């Protein structure tokens, strides 16, 4: 047996008949035991996670890293306390707003000292006040545009005439916007005009009607009108007698006679007494030809004398 065992060569046996080493069997047995032990642990862990998720969904807890939801008091915003202004503070603020709608830092600090407020509160008040003023201006312009009138000076509109009406600084709303009545003025041109010239200037329709008057109706008006025309011509001759005599005795002048600049206001009367008498005898219609003023008959040299 020993010889047989000693003489027996294991290398000549096939691999299937060879005995396996003992350490390989131990490792395989250990791996099998570890896999069997791992499976129930994994199953228990998955079951515990599923139960935790179901409980969280049932209770309505938000899912987070720590499993704890945020504090609801932190989510709610803290409401700022409103500032209640007194009537004196509002009076100072409104008076400043009417003077300047965009005060700088120094002015806001002064207002804060006057009104016993902080500069931040004054700044916020002016910001809100400007927003209200712009909204009111916009509404007024829309109303005026609907009525068919577009204001050209919208910036001159005063804001909020119904607010703080009892204060003295807001008296602009009670002031009358109507202009002062036109005072009686003395016009030297019309006062210096003679009744004849004023009658001749503003009696166009009457003269036209007299010209279109039939000859049968004009007989009674001939003597009176002829006498008034004669008196006017005599007055003009007396006034311009001295100037005409000096013009006749003066030497010749190279300049031509100047034109009268006031041709519109020339007196319309008859040129001579003879033509008036002739027309009055013939009972013709009355047409007044223009009579040159005494100054127009003088030449340029006689103006200097």
UniProtKB/Swiss-Prot annotation:
Pfam families: Homeodomain, OAR. GO terms for cellular component: nucleus. Residues 138-270 are annotated as: Interaction with PIT-1. Residues 53-66 have a biased composition (Basic and acidic residues). GO terms for molecular function: DNA-binding transcription factor activity; DNA-binding transcription factor activity, RNA polymerase II-specific; RNA polymerase II cis-regulatory region sequence-specific DNA binding. Residues 78-137 bind DNA. Residues 1-92 are annotated as: Disordered. A motif (Nuclear localization signal) lies at residues 284-288. A motif (OAR) lies at residues 271-284. Keywords: Activator, Developmental protein, DNA-binding, Homeobox, Nucleus, Transcription, Transcription regulation. One of its GO terms (biological process) is regulation of transcription by RNA polymerase II. It is found in: Nucleus. Residues 74-83 have a biased composition (Basic residues). CDD domains: homeodomain (cd00086). The keyword Transcription applies. Belongs to the paired homeobox family. Bicoid subfamily. Sequence-specific transcription factor that binds gene promoters and activates their transcription. May play a role in the development of anterior structures, and in particular, the brain and facies and in specifying the identity or structure of hindlimb. This is Pituitary homeobox 1. It comes from Xenopus laevis. The gene is pitx1.
